Amino acid sequence: MRVYADGSALVRYLPAPDHSVDWQRWAEQHGPELLVTSLSLIELRHALTTTPAHVRARVHALVDRLEVVRYSDQAVAAAATIDAGLSPFASIHLGVAVAHPDVTAFASYDGRLADAAATHGLEIVSPGLADGWWHAGTRAAARPPALS
């Protein structure tokens, strides 16, 4: 199983967001399975701008071990055809995950994006949240501010 992680998952490497401890424990065990893009890393780096230097250094050391994948033509084509009410950046996240032949799961804490990923047949990984949290009705309570 390879897991694509969006920015809403990666910011859980910071101490403040909800479920950060759950994410960090899960990621410690599954780090080699994670794939990210430059977009995921940009979202994380944006969140790091107000954190202390020692936290930034720790997070950079963790994410430097992640595999960064490029945007393939197939990923861009998939992103362009996704019709789930997603932002263009969220569509790119999903397009990369859907087009990558080894990705079977999607790590996210963004309800709309998790819902779209599940609709496209990906297992949702959101340590600390209940299975199916992204479904309509529970989405508003569980969804953190969107990064995408």
Model-derived features: where do they sit?
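Short beta-strand scaffold positions
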Residues: 5, 35-36, 70, 88-91, ...
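A general structural signal for well-ordered alpha-helical segments in protein cores
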Residues: 20, 41, 56-59, 76, ...
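Short active-site oxyanion
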Residues: 1, 30-34, 64-67, 101-105
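Acidic catalytic patch
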Residues: 64-87, 92-96, 116
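Alpha-helix capping/helix-boundary segments
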Residues: 9-10, 40, 75, 93, ...
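His/Asp/Glu-enriched, well-ordered alpha-helical/loop segment
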Residues: 44
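Short, well-structured N-terminal submotif of metal-dependent ribonuclease cores
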Residues: 1-36, 48-60, 122, 132-136, ...
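Acidic, PIN/NYN-like endoribonuclease modules and their adjacent C-terminal/linker elements
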Residues: 37, 41, 98-148
